[in-house]
Amino acid sequence: MLLFVEQVASKGTGLNPNAKVWQEIAPGNTDATPVTHGTESSWHEIAATSGAHPEGNAELSEDICKEYEVMYSSSCETTRNTTGIEESTDGMILGPEDLSYQIYDVSGESNSAVSTEDLKECLKKQLEFCFSRENLSKDLYLISQMDSDQFIPIWTVANMEEIKKLTTDPDLILEVLRSSPMVQVDEKGEKVRPSHKRCIVILREIPETTPIEEVKGLFKSENCPKVISCEFAHNSNWYITFQSDTDAQQAFKYLREEVKTFQGKPIMARIKAINTFFAKNGYRLMDSSIYSHPIQTQAQYASPVFMQPVYNPHQQYSVYSIVPQSWSPNPTPYFETPLAPFPNGSFVNGFNSPGSYKTNAAAMNMGRPFQKNRVKPQFRSSGGSEHSTEGSVSLGDGQLNRYSSRNFPAERHNPTVTGHQEQTYLQKETSTLQVEQNGDYGRGRRTLFRGRRRREDDRISRPHPSTAESKAPTPKFDLLASNFPPLPGSSSRMPGELVLENRMSDVVKGVYKEKDNEELTISCPVPADEQTECTSAQQLNMSTSSPCAAELTALSTTQQEKDLIEDSSVQKDGLNQTTIPVSPPSTTKPSRASTASPCNNNINAATAVALQEPRKLSYAEVCQKPPKEPSSVLVQPLRELRSNVVSPTKNEDNGAPENSVEKPHEKPEARASKDYSGFRGNIIPRGAAGKIREQRRQFSHRAIPQGVTRRNGKEQYVPPRSPK
């Protein structure tokens, strides 16, 4: 046996007592059988049987026992000791077991030592405190366990730590709860709730200066129960408290039926309910938030966000964004939760941030989406020739005009037409911004609105460049129908177009003749009858020079093209006469002011501006009349009328007519390609541009029938010619 102890000591000092080595050795020795049930009992047994052995072995066993006690809990020790009792017959093992039972017995003796009445009294005080007004205003756990009728399960109350320290008997707890006037137990004895006493009678419209004895004197009667207290509350209200609800109801009936008046006034009385724990007439306002309050100490901002859908229809304080928000655990959700969905003051404060953000976003985006169709819808919607031609001619610098249309200094050289376009642009932009400012407050709606607007802009702008590009290569044929008003009859229209083909070829030939002989035309005489005709021709060029210098360069190119063709047709009509000296250029200046307005009106005819005398109408009248003179116009050379072309060119090009003289043989096709590639502006000579216009006019229908003098809207300002 001694050897066994030494082996155990050598192996067990540094090992776990639960190691398999102990269990393997135990079956081989009958004395060590209790080891399987509890090592501590075996050590006690060894210590008892080894009384004659050296003290070192006993000390070793005690050390091992101490180490074992540290490693195991008391509950595990108790279970092991109880199993050891069953198999061991030695009485010394019962020491620890007796100790554990003594601890239990001591607790029982302490309960029995305290009288039952004292226990009930302590339990009653604890339960009444749990259901008191002060505790329920802070105890979120009890509030969370209440149902819609403020009932709490009794087993919930019995499991509270304060109650468990006193007793665990549910019958005793139920008995104490039924005896307490502060709570009310249901019929089954399963639930309990705070008792709402209605034992206070409120007397209204009684001044505070009224002596309290007079108020109490109202209830001094045999038919009225005894008054417990009488006090002034506020606003001329007096509170008279009675013992129970029955007494309060009896006193209320007594005042209404017997007393009726006090100080010459009818008595105004009502019964007030005493809320023993909360000032808000019950808990029904907190039902929606009871399950989120326990989390409030950990995440205080999670509860109000969760409660927003519940209180959304009843947000009484949504207008006041300055109301301070309390995030304390104090459960007053009636005031706290309606304010909780508005931690962001900018949303409540007049919806300023969504509106200003929308306006700024629209202002930043007004460059690209709106510039695309700012100029093009002008001539697309119009039926006039000026804007239609502008759409076809100005494609070369369409990108430049598209992105710089809001650049006012860049367009200061063309105020006539660009001013109108800019005005239309600003009006449309302003109306769009007003709709955006007032139309939407929500972010989702704003996004949908912006997407819908951009889709509409894309539908407007995408098809349009394709149509304009399709017009660009063939402007002579696509623009035939839009340049002229409908004529009364088609019979007079068809011969005009046939004469156009016969005559424009001669016009082109005449152009090259006048370019070759340009040096010799200044001193040639012109007949007296032709003086006014030349003056009118100069007036045409002079009048078109002033507005066209102020327009867009594309418009100026188109307008000068038309006027020079008309000038050449007038020159050919004037060649039938004998030559006399040309009238001085000063004769054209008095009529310049009078002829400028019809030209401007013709320019703005397509943009729905009121016109007085468009040239198209006069052409329709001319086409309906039969030719008066024979078609022997181009027999004579055109050099006599070179001054009519040179002088207006000087006015247009600011004294640079030499450009048209130096480049007389430049091909019209090359000039047309330059015209499309962006070389339109003040750099292009007007004389060279005239060749392009006359080349284009071969396919146009503005030519005058043979032998017929050009008659347009400006003839009303031209003095009549002398008879032949």
Swiss-Prot record:
Keywords: Acetylation, Cytoplasm, Methylation, Phosphoprotein, Protein biosynthesis, RNA-binding. GO terms for cellular component: cytoplasmic stress granule; cytosol; membrane. Residues 374-477, 568-600, 623-724 are annotated as: Disordered. InterPro entries: La_dom_prot, La_HTH, LARP4_RRM, RBD_domain_sf, WH-like_DNA-bd_sf, WH_DNA-bd_sf. The keyword Ribosomal protein does not apply. Residues 111-303 are annotated as: Interaction with the poly-A tract of mRNA. Residues 415-437, 574-600 have a biased composition (Polar residues). Residues 13-22 are annotated as: Interaction with PABPC1. Residues 113-202 form the HTH La-type RNA-binding domain. Interacts (via N-terminal region) with PABPC1. Interacts with RACK1. This is La-related protein 4. It comes from Homo sapiens.
